[in-house]
Amino acid sequence: MRYIRLCIISLLATLPLAVHASPQPLEQIKLSESQLSGRVGMIEMDLASGRTLTAWRADERFPMMSTFKVVLCGAVLARVDAGDEQLERKIHYRQQDLVDYSPVSEKHLADGMTVGELCAAAITMSDNSAANLLLATVGGPAGLTAFLRQIGDNVTRLDRWETELNEALPGDARGTTTPASMAATLRKLLTSQRLSARSQRQLLQWMVDDRVAGPLIRSVLPAGWFIADKTGAGERGARGIVALLGPNNKAERIVVIYLRDTPASMAERNQQIAGIGAALIEHWQR
């Protein structure tokens, strides 16, 4: 009997450790806000139903940064579906069209790039000049905002071009969205009739091929899980990611995480987003 009591006591002693080692998603977000001395906005949404599963500051505005490039390429694909654009169309540009961080487009000054290649560069490598060239095809920031209104997003707005849109001034609504609005818009682009099935597959594939998101949720993704994502980084501690996740290599949920107004380093911001992602995944697996 004494042996059984000792076993029970030993088992109970381990329970608090397990809880503290694996915080619930909202607990992790609150911890991240404290450690970052900034603000975190997050939503976890079921892809099929659109039901919100977890949310924190989901209706507060955060800078989009480069996460807008997914919506931009969605607008480009909508034009392709309407017969107003072709992914194979070649766009030529000049040295003066290039802005900071253009790792792909800077190599093609002589031969130009197709619309499809520009979208791939904008999403997979976050190429800023590629994004600006694509923005010009949809009517600039105002044209992209108009597209958002057409598909029912009355919150998200783009007001400037790369790279000025990453300024992330406190209280500035320019170039912002909310986690809830971004998740709903991404869901519309990937599941509704806003885009053809072919264009939906293409947009998703570009996100699957993202090559600059390694330190974030991808760093904590279990084996066999699906991820398609796009990150963003800005001034004044702004950082963000929009992603689709799921076990068994299937996209089942949309996760949007934004940070702002933190003095933390890029490495610290990446670590906090990864920690939130890990908490979401672990809670999902229970």
From Swiss-Prot:
The active site is at residues 66, 164. Substrate binds at residues 230-232. Keywords: Antibiotic resistance, Disulfide bond, Hydrolase, Signal. The keyword Cell inner membrane does not apply. Transmembrane segments: none annotated. The class A beta-lactamase family has a specific amino-acid numbering system, sometimes called Ambler or ABL numbering and often misspelt as Amber. A multiple sequence alignment was used to derive a consensus sequence and then the consensus was numbered taking into account insertions and deletions. This allows use of identical numbers, e.g. for active site residues, despite differences in protein length. UniProt always uses natural numbering of residues, hence there appear to be differences in numbering between this entry and some papers. Hydrolyzes ampicillin. Can also hydrolyze cephaloridine, aztreonam and ceftazidime with a low catalytic rate. This is Beta-lactamase SHV-24. It comes from Escherichia coli. The gene is bla.
